Design a protein with these regions (language model features):
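Aromatic sugar-binding surface patches on proteins
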Residues: 113, 346-380
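Extended active-site neighborhood of metal-dependent phosphoesterases/phosphodiesterases
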Residues: 8-9, 13, 21, 98-191, ...
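Active-site glycine-centered loops adjacent to acidic/histidine catalytic or metal-binding residues
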Residues: 51, 91-92, 120-121, 200, ...
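Edge beta-strands of extracellular beta-sandwich domains
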Residues: 12-21, 289, 400-408
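Binuclear metal-dependent phosphoesterase catalytic core
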Residues: 246-332, 374-384, 389-404
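N-terminal active-site segment of His-dependent metallophosphoesterases
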Residues: 8-9, 16, 21-102, 386
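Conserved structural position at the C-terminal beta-strand
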Residues: 4-6, 394
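Short acidic, glycine-rich surface-loop motifs adjacent to enzyme active sites
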Residues: 186-207
Length: 408
């Protein structure tokens, strides 16, 4: 391919919902058509969704009736205010069933906002054992596997960090070609600029056995920039400050635990949904948008006696938490302090599996879909016996507070 780095304030025309900023190398010269899209350096909204990954009738139905309409609605809410909106799908658009690429392109087009794609391990042809060649079907429908574009004041870099071996086997990492390309591209990006780096597998994950190949080389290239990495692959949520200038949003799957039955949570307890980033004159703000909920749905509490292992404590789940957030509680109007963080199993997803086993005879034996036992975004406190009313106040990284109260 030959492609253009789409400048801020413009968008390439879409085919099947995805921007066509590229052309095949079969002519001596190429002309690229771009349309105005907002204002140069102006406001915009971006939605980052990970692991749509449908396989089977139920998964496609839920993706097309729950997830895509939600994305469309949020996108249209921004565009009704003359704020351009687009989305990024962070890989595993399908689940090895690549014959469904034409179908999912048709459904993506119905969202009616531009969708930039990222290639994931399940988007490779499992019958091909060569990394580059195994992406042939993806390229046919979506274009280059790595590229760049601009939006607002931000610079976007999209990477392919799946080293595919064939037959569903792969490693996660970067090759020489892409590292050299990133290094060359950054010569045109001023130091101090803000970058979004989008790739399927995360740069970091709290599972100590995980390692992205050549990740240090990649991160070293971003010295002098402000960087937010957007990734998926794990199907759970993990927001991490990797370096002083680099933060990663490893985003839980929009389908939760692989669209399991009628489930509405990932196996770590994150509701099915996606991240929304708003870019404007004051920089970047973000929130997690749960499907079927408004933007203020950012935490959930569990009364005393409802969480195994914490029976005498009030517990709170804050799925989009990072180290800039605060989780505080009040007793009868008096601030008591911050709640303590703990790692544990999500009571919602765990009870969902229990309920399905008891009432419908469904026994989840697949190890990969069992509840995550070390999700880190839970908080607890032991209220005083005399407290009558408890208020929980969660403050996000942007300084916005969310409140819920309960009788004790």
């Amino acid at each position: 391919f030959i492609y253009v780095v789409t400048p801020s304030g413009y968008m390439a025309p879409c085919n099947g919902g995805t921007p066509v900023f590229y052309k095949t190398l079969n002519e001596n010269s190429h002309d690229f058509q771009l349309h105005r899209w907002g204002t140069v350096g102006g406001k915009y909204a971006m939605m980052a969704a990970a692991d749509t990954q449908p396989r089977g009738e139920n998964a496609f139905h839920r993706l097309e009736t729950e997830a895509f309409p939600d994305l469309k609605q949020v996108g249209f809410e921004y565009m009704s205010q003359n704020i351009p909106a687009f989305a990024i799908f962070l890989g595993d658009i399908l689940w090895d069933n690549l014959e469904m690429f034409p179908h999912i392109k048709q459904e993506i087009a119905k969202i009616q906002i531009p969708i930039y794609p990222v290639i994931g391990n399940h988007d490779h042809d499992k019958e091909v054992s060569d990394d580059d060649a195994s992406a042939h079907l993806y390229r046919h429908f979506f274009g280059p596997t790595y590229y760049a574009f601009n939006a607002g004041k931000d610079y976007y870099i999209v990477l392919d960090n799946i080293l595919y071996k064939g037959n569903k086997k792969y490693e996660v990492g970067l090759n020489d070609q892409q590292l050299n390309w990133v290094k060359s591209y950054l010569q045109y990006v001023p130091k101090g600029a803000h970058l979004f780096v989008c790739m399927h597998a995360p740069a970091y994950f709290y599972n100590e056995n995980y390692k992205l190949g050549r990740v240090a080389e990649l991160l070293d290239l971003f010295e002098g920039y402000k960087v937010d990495i957007l990734s998926g692959h794990t199907h759970v949520q993990c927001n991490t400050q990797i370096r002083n200038n680099i933060r990663e949003y490893n985003i839980a799957s929009i389908g939760g635990a692989w669209w399991l039955w009628d489930g509405i949570y990932s196996k770590d307890g994150t509701p099915i949904g996606y991240q929304v980033f708003e870019s404007g004159k004051n920089g970047i703000a973000n929130y997690f948008k749960s499907l079927g909920h408004d933007r203020d749905y950012q935490f959930r509490y569990y009364p005393v006696g409802t969480v195994p292992g914490h029976e005498d404590e009030l517990c709170v789940k804050v799925w989009n938490w990072d180290n800039r957030w605060k989780v505080e509680y009040y007793e009868d109007g008096k601030l008591k302090g911050e709640m303590k963080q703990y790692k544990g199993m999500d009571p919602d997803y765990d009870f969902f599996l229990q309920r399905k086993a008891v009432t419908e005879g469904k026994d989840m034996k697949e190890r990969g879909r069992q509840a995550n036992k070390n999700a880190y975004f839970f908080f607890s406190t032991k209220p005083s016996d005399k407290a009558k009313k408890i208020k929980i106040v969660v403050t996000d990284a942007n300084g916005k507070s969310y409140e819920q109260s309960l009788e004790h």
